[in-house]
Amino acid sequence: MVNEMRDNTVPHMTREDMEKRANEVANLLKTLSHPVRLMLVCTLVEGEFSVGELEQQIGIGQPTLSQQLGVLRESGIVETRRNIKQIFYRLTEAKAAQLVNALYTIFCTQEKQA
């Protein structure tokens, strides 16, 4: 199993490059480590949603939703667009979308096959 991973490794990196990448990945994983934030990003992979739509889709109350969206916004994973009185959120971080898709493949599609 570990040997399979070696076939997909990236070319050799310098220690400094590896450290920089490790910090980038750790920060992204830290941001996505909260269940509500992970559910939000999973939902936003599908497209742009208003706060009301996210609240309904995820089933989380407005205060918690706003707090977690704020964390995602501050980290640069999502951005907002205002349309009259509604605020819409969309994913801006491609790496977050790729990670969520990989997690979905690992954790969700295998359960369907079992």
Swiss-Prot record:
One of its GO terms (molecular function) is DNA binding. PROSITE patterns: HTH_ARSR_2 (PS50987). Keywords: DNA-binding, Repressor, Transcription, Transcription regulation. InterPro entries: ArsR-like_HTH, HTH_ArsR_DNA-bd_dom, Metal_resp_trans_reg, WH-like_DNA-bd_sf, WH_DNA-bd_sf. Residues 51-74 bind DNA. Residues 17-111 form the HTH arsR-type domain. The keyword DNA-binding applies. It comes from the Bacteria. Represses an operon that probably comprises itself, PD_1892, PD_1893, PD_1894 and blh. Binds to a palindromic AT-rich sequence spanning the -10 region of the blh promoter and blocks transcription of the operon. This is Biofilm growth-associated repressor.
